[in-house]
């Protein structure tokens, strides 16, 4: 009786521990697709077209601008800041985008892991301490500028992913 159970378990042993790794190309493809989806969601919000991502708006300097070269760590840091900003906006338009940013950060962590990189916990979020004051003064402007700059940053990230960014 015990032998049959043991034999059955030993027969299944290789299948129980067989884990097929997800090809890194699939993760990179999913990352690019999610970036394109987020950009499309931003485009669907009509009022984001009114501000250039390069335009400077007084009081909103804490919102990241465009970067010429981004590493995976810098991408994660930038997305963490945008996610923190979007979470604090009361608009319903940004809830799904904020959730998508969380998923995008998870995919970036997988890409980093595949390159044996360790992404540190996102820091610099302490610069957002004054976010509440800014939101009270200019809620609409903050949303428009944040989404516009996020869109530009995502397009930069899409381009950088084709170049296989470093850690």
Curated annotation (Swiss-Prot):
Residues 1-21 form the signal peptide. InterPro entries: 4_helix_cytokine-like_core, Leptin. It comes from Macaca mulatta. Disulfide bonds join 117-167. Keywords: Disulfide bond, Obesity, Secreted, Signal. Key player in the regulation of energy balance and body weight control. Once released into the circulation, has central and peripheral effects by binding LEPR, found in many tissues, which results in the activation of several major signaling pathways. In the hypothalamus, acts as an appetite-regulating factor that induces a decrease in food intake and an increase in energy consumption by inducing anorexinogenic factors and suppressing orexigenic neuropeptides, also regulates bone mass and secretion of hypothalamo-pituitary-adrenal hormones. It is found in: Secreted. This is Leptin. One of its GO terms (molecular function) is DNA binding. GO terms for biological process: activation of protein kinase C activity; adipose tissue development; adult feeding behavior; angiogenesis; aorta development; bile acid metabolic process; bone growth; cell surface receptor signaling pathway via JAK-STAT. GO terms for cellular component: cytoplasm; extracellular space. Pfam families: Leptin. Belongs to the leptin family.
